[in-house]
Amino acid sequence: MAESMNKIFIAIIAIAVAAAATKMFTSEEPKSKALPVLVKGEYMQFPLVSIKKLNRNSAIYRFKLPTDEHVLGLPIGQHITIKAHIDGSEVVRSYTPISLDSEAKGYFELLIKSYEQGKISKMFTSLKIGDTIDVQGPKGFYEYTDRSSKHLAMIAGGSGLTPMYQIIKSIAENPKDKTKVTFIYGNVEEIDILLRDDLDKFAASKPGQITIHYLLDKPSENWKGGSGYVTPELMKEKLPAPADGVQLLVCGPLPMVSAIKRSAVALGFPKAKPVSKMNDQVFVF
């Protein structure tokens, strides 16, 4: 009897060991955790790996991170600072990447519109594959989460699109994010509308939740969107009225931003502060 029980016990142990070994060799490796690369207050260099031309003066520049497991480490809505030495002087400018840490492992992307008087933006047009840029971050006082607001009213002009694009993309790709977005995006001509296909795709993915209104200064005869400037009347017609849970986000050329801030006050929004903070109802990037 004792011998029989010993045999049963040994058999049970053997089965358990075999099962454990099978699990050890067949289980999937745990997914490696993304490694943020940015260190606040420190400049880091990243090499250019590709350029995608969008139109006559805009392109997407992709830069490589140290490994494919690294992410930039930038909260949604924040920006980086780029430093360059141009004509004997140090020049610093801020840019918001269009890539999100949730998808961009091993790289980050910047949408750059080159302006005639823009020293850094013109510097980008001279970059060649393998050239590096000096980057510091994260910077900024806005950090989007799906609990930030119930309804985001956005207004942007030209390359001021980039922080809005990041936020809209995050909302569109998160099934649990129910934040409403109403976005007025102004440009000079139709060719100047940046990442339009992506924006239309985001809106189509959540109809009724994400709404985008295009506005042109110089529309063609066949243009079916809006025309002119962002006026108080247009804001009142297209955007939500000021209320709890509504936040107005603004980014673009200084004259446009100044006019929008005045219009927002006329519509009942509080006056924008000189430096916007996360909980301000009017936030200027």
Curated annotation (Swiss-Prot):
Catalysed transformations (reactions): 2 Fe(III)-[cytochrome b5] + NADH = 2 Fe(II)-[cytochrome b5] + NAD(+) + H(+); 2 Fe(3+)-[Dph3] + NADH = 2 Fe(2+)-[Dph3] + NAD(+) + H(+)
UniProt organism field: Vanderwaltozyma polyspora (strain ATCC 22028 / DSM 70294 / BCRC 21397 / CBS 2163 / NBRC 10782 / NRRL Y-8283 / UCD 57-17) (Kluyveromyces polysporus)
**Known function:** NADH-dependent reductase for DPH3 and cytochrome b5. Required for the first step of diphthamide biosynthesis, a post-translational modification of histidine which occurs in elongation factor 2. DPH1 and DPH2 transfer a 3-amino-3-carboxypropyl (ACP) group from S-adenosyl-L-methionine (SAM) to a histidine residue, the reaction is assisted by a reduction system comprising DPH3 and a NADH-dependent reductase, predominantly CBR1. By reducing DPH3, also involved in the formation of the tRNA wobble base modification mcm5s 2U (5-methoxycarbonylmethyl-2-thiouridine), mediated by the elongator complex.
- Which residues are listed for FAD binding in this entry? 125-140, 151-183
Pfam families, sorted: FAD_binding_6, NAD_binding_1
Write down the superkingdom of origin. Eukaryota
Q: Its quaternary structure?
A: Monomer. Component of the 2-(3-amino-3-carboxypropyl)histidine synthase complex composed of DPH1, DPH2, DPH3 and a NADH-dependent reductase, predominantly CBR1.
State the membrane topology: Single-pass membrane protein
Q: Provide the top EC class.
A: oxidoreductase
The keyword Oxidoreductase is annotated on this UniProt entry:
yes
Name of the molecule in the record: NADH-cytochrome b5 reductase 1
Cite the entry's keywords alphabetically.
FAD, Flavoprotein, Membrane, Mitochondrion, Mitochondrion outer membrane, NAD, Oxidoreductase, Transferase, Transmembrane, Transmembrane helix
Pathways per UniProt:
Protein modification; peptidyl-diphthamide biosynthesis
